[in-house]
Amino acid sequence: MGSLSIWHWIVVIAVVLLLFGRGKISDLMGDVAQGIKAFKKGMQDDDKAPEKTEPVKSIDHGATPSATRTDVGSKAV
């Protein structure tokens, strides 16, 4: 009672083919294959090292005077 016989599988496959048709199933499998190829290509692109990086440029701030903070509108107590 727990296992499916060959006739159960034939009926299930027939229903699936009637619902989706041959064209839709092949289109679906083609889309899955394209997705897998795109995923593999993306994984290979991540493995490649960057070709050339430019050195980081730093900005020299020098001796700039620091601003003093004044509270506007506050009353001294």
Swiss-Prot record:
Residues 43-77 are annotated as: Disordered. Gene3D superfamilies: 1.20.5.3310. Keywords: Cell inner membrane, Cell membrane, Membrane, Protein transport, Translocation, Transmembrane, Transmembrane helix, Transport. GO terms for molecular function: protein transmembrane transporter activity. It is a single-pass membrane protein. It is found in: Cell inner membrane. It comes from the Bacteria. GO terms for biological process: protein transport by the Tat complex. Residues 43-60 have a biased composition (Basic and acidic residues). One of its GO terms (cellular component) is TAT protein transport complex. InterPro entries: TatA/B/E, TatA/E. The chain crosses the membrane at residues 1-21. Belongs to the TatA/E family. Part of the twin-arginine translocation (Tat) system that transports large folded proteins containing a characteristic twin-arginine motif in their signal peptide across membranes. TatA could form the protein-conducting channel of the Tat system. The Tat system comprises two distinct complexes: a TatABC complex, containing multiple copies of TatA, TatB and TatC subunits, and a separate TatA complex, containing only TatA subunits. Substrates initially bind to the TatABC complex, which probably triggers association of the separate TatA complex to form the active translocon. This is Sec-independent protein translocase protein TatA.
